[in-house]
From Swiss-Prot:
GO terms for cellular component: mitochondrial inner membrane; respiratory chain complex IV. This is Cytochrome c oxidase subunit 1. It is found in: Mitochondrion inner membrane. It comes from Buteo buteo. Coiled coil: none annotated. Its main location: mitochondrion. It catalyses: 4 Fe(II)-[cytochrome c] + O2 + 8 H(+)(in) = 4 Fe(III)-[cytochrome c] + 2 H2O + 4 H(+)(out).
């Protein structure tokens, strides 16, 4: 098999998963570089980069790169492709060629996003791309149009991937295996895929109408022609809120596996509760979108509903957190690097969840909307939730993917540096938000200097952690410590073929004997 046949025309779920992981790692470094530019600008009062337009282009690109080209490709494309077929005993994904197309739509999409910043003044709209700022008056030229096309491609990629994962998870498992006997990671990817399938078409509709408003003189979002910019916000957030659950749900699945494994348990605590909690989160995620819009002047009854509905999501989330803690209870805990990431995840995700409950209150949110408190909140659940879950999964399954082991001491040190960095970066932002510092500005009054400086120092510590991780991965490949026989394979099906598994697995159907 030639290099080109293997890597460009691949129909193998393991190879495509590897492509997704490499692409996501690369995009993650681009997104990190952008975030360091943001923190460099905000490290001291005064201007570093120039005007707010270039600053907002960087902020917008940082969000898009991290969401669409780092977290989703790694969690869904990388871990999803590698593990879902192995965990259900399928020979591959249901639609292997469509799987390849889903991946190869992402590099062109990334290219279009980068192109958007090189023409005119760039797309400095924020990741929400709200009109009228995103309209053709405030953003003349092709920048926003290129960003919209980038989102179109990334969206098509995700929709096709979602169809593939739904079909695979439901139809490719052995007949004897009920859906309620599949591992939690498979469930998490299945639910994520359903969310993608239902939410992305709404985003596509919204940005397509924005595209025609900009180029074909329609007025969907222009009051002068009977349109309404608030309609765009509803369409965007009907996608945008499920999207944040799309980013965290596969992480929930990863953490369930890692915690169970390193607590020495043969199953997670409360399997059914975990499944129904994820199903509930997936459903509720669709009926809370307007909590992002408490400041647009909605009716008081509407605000009351969205406040209460948002708070209800804390219940299934709490079920998951306490089930992880119950899984740990009474276990023989192995303090390996993946376990450290998982414990860090549980702690920091819970803090992020608590600030989310604060922001759910529509009255409080009037004061905190577009302030740094919101930035702190969602970076606790993303930068320390999604990213910690990715690193837990990566350190846990690295031997499965490569056949080599990471250096345990280096990996623990990396956790320590990263934990320090992200907390020093984002904890002070709660204080800035409560003190009234607004988001998306490149400068600030000098009263805010202390916490901003600390936050920027934290970002440099996190950068050090990223460099450490690159070294740790290099060291693992250079030292070639092989895994001879993985343990606990009876309850962790993905490991039964050895490390790494052969190119083709389950070529003949798996024999499944269901325990009564």
């Amino acid at each position: 098999m030639t290099f080109i046949n293997r890597w460009l025309f691949s129909t193998n779920h393991k190879d495509i998963g590897t492509l997704y992981l490499i692409f996501g790692a690369w995009a993650g470094m681009v997104g990190t570089a952008l975030s360091l530019l943001i923190r460099a600008e905000l490290g001291q009062p005064g201007t570093l980069l120039g005007d707010d337009q270039i600053y907002n282009v960087i902020v917008t690109a940082h969000a898009f790169v991290m969401i669409f080209f780092m977290v989703m490709p790694i969690m869904i494309g990388g871990f999803g492709n590698w593990l879902v077929p192995l965990m259900i005993g399928a020979p591959d994904m249901a639609f292997p060629r469509m799987n390849n197309m889903s991946f190869w739509l992402l590099p062109p999409s990334f290219l279009l996003l980068l192109a958007s910043s090189t023409v005119e003044a760039g797309a400095g709209t924020g990741w929400t791309v709200y009109p009228p700022l995103a309209g053709n008056m405030a953003h003349a030229g092709a920048s926003v149009d290129l960003a919209i096309f980038s989102l179109h491609l990334a969206g098509v990629s995700s929709i096709l991937g979602a169809i593939n994962f739904i079909t695979t998870a439901i139809n490719m498992k052995p007949p004897a295996l009920s859906q309620y006997q599949t591992p939690l990671f498979v469930w998490s990817v299945l639910i994520t895929a359903v969310l993608l399938l239902l939410s992305l078409p709404v985003l596509a509709a919204g940005i397509t109408m924005l595209l025609t408003d900009r180029n074909l003189n329609t007025t969907f979002f222009d009051p002068a022609g009977g349109g309404d910019p608030i309609l765009y916000q509803h369409l965007f957030w009907f996608f945008g809120h499920p999207e944040v659950y799309i980013l965290i749900l596969p992480g929930f699945g990863i953490i369930s596996h890692v915690v169970t494994y390193y607590a020495g348990k043969k199953e997670p605590f409360g399997y059914m509760g975990m499944v129904w909690a994820m199903l509930s989160i997936g459903f509720l995620g669709f009926i809370v979108w307007a909590h992002h819009m408490f400041t647009v002047g909605m009716d008081v009854d509407t605000r009351a509903y969205f406040t209460s509905a948002t708070m209800i999501i804390a219940i299934p989330t709490g079920i998951k957190v306490f089930s992880w803690l119950a899984t740990l209870h009474g276990g023989t805990i192995k303090w390996d690097p993946p376990m450290l990431w998982a414990l860090g995840f549980i702690f920091l995700f819970t803090i992020g969840g608590l600030t989310g409950i604060v922001l759910a209150n529509s009255s409080l949110d009037i004061a905190l909307h577009d302030a740094y408190y919101v930035v702190a909140h969602f970076h606790y659940v993303l930068s320390m939730g999604a990213v910690f879950a990715i690193l837990a999964g990566f350190t846990h399954w690295f031997p499965l993917l490569t056949g080599f082991t990471l250096h345990p001491t280096w990996a623990k040190a990396h956790f320590g540096v990263m934990f320090t960095g992200v907390n020093l970066t984002f904890f002070p932002q709660h204080f800035l938000g409560l003190a009234g510092m607004p988001r998306r500005y490149s400068d600030y009054p000098d009263a805010y200097t202390l916490w901003n400086t600390l936050s920027s120092i934290g970002s440099l510590i996190s950068m050090t952690a990223v460099i450490m991780l690159m070294f740790i991965i290099w060291e693992a490949f250079a030292s070639k410590r092989k895994i001879l026989q993985p343990e606990l394979t009876t309850t962790n099906v993905e490991w039964i073929h050895g490390c790494p598994p052969p190119y083709h697995t389950f070529e003949e159907p798996a024999f499944v004997q269901v325990q009564e």
